[in-house]
Swiss-Prot record:
UniProt keyword annotations, A-Z: Nucleus, RNA-binding
Stated family: Belongs to the PNO1 family.
Coiled coil (UniProt feature): none
Pfam family, one: KH_PNO1_2nd
Gene Ontology terms describing biological process: ribosomal small subunit biogenesis
Region (Disordered): 1-63
Protein name: RNA-binding protein PNO1
Biological role: Part of the small subunit (SSU) processome, first precursor of the small eukaryotic ribosomal subunit. During the assembly of the SSU processome in the nucleolus, many ribosome biogenesis factors, an RNA chaperone and ribosomal proteins associate with the nascent pre-rRNA and work in concert to generate RNA folding, modifications, rearrangements and cleavage as well as targeted degradation of pre-ribosomal RNA by the RNA exosome. Positively regulates dimethylation of two adjacent adenosines in the loop of a conserved hairpin near the 3'-end of 18S rRNA.
Cited SMART domains: KH
Amino acid sequence: METQSTGTEDGFTPVTHRGGRRAKKRQAEQSSAAGQDGEAGRMDTEEARPAKRPVFPPLSGDQLLTGKEETRKIPVPGNRYTPLKENWMKIFTPIVEHLGLQIRFNLKSRNVEIRTCKDTKDVSALTKAADFVKAFVLGFQVEDALALIRLDDLFLESFEITDVKPLKGDHLSRAIGRIAGKGGKTKFTIENVTRTRIVLADVHVHILGSFQNIKMARTAICNLILGNPPSKVYGNIRAVASRSADRF
């Protein structure tokens, strides 16, 4: 085995193996290669990262609506044909004049069809008009349903009495009677206290109002379905309504 010797003061001769030199050389090459790779990766990262976040200006309604026309179809049940015909101008006027949409009633498919056109300025106009017509079809008055176009924080919620409690026969009829009350007194009281509008159509209950008010009205109606006396329900919703008024 070859060695390299150098003299020292103590007389000892240090021995260096050739294999050791090769190992050191290999380690130096690996460390230099790793350093180059790290620099290259860092450079790639720096190049990939943009210098500034891109800023896109907001699009106007005209730019968003350019392209294919959008359409909404609202089916009309048979029992709402006559009210729709009688109140057609009240429905037609705000949708066409204020929202800039096109509307028609398709006699063949029995749907109210609403679509956008070049006069449509607001992106959300089609959704507002569809909610307005849907509310009228469900049984709300035109004046009440019109609030869906004027205000942004109003919603529709529908559920069935049997979703709350599986009732049948006379038990179901009594539950409907508890919700309506004598001459509609209970329903009107819930509407006035919670500032909502309620439509009771057989086993279907439709509520129109803001999110918090719908929650209060729904809780009161569910308590009536479950059998709570109306006087207790009145007290509960009045207490909740007064707390909400104090909070805001």
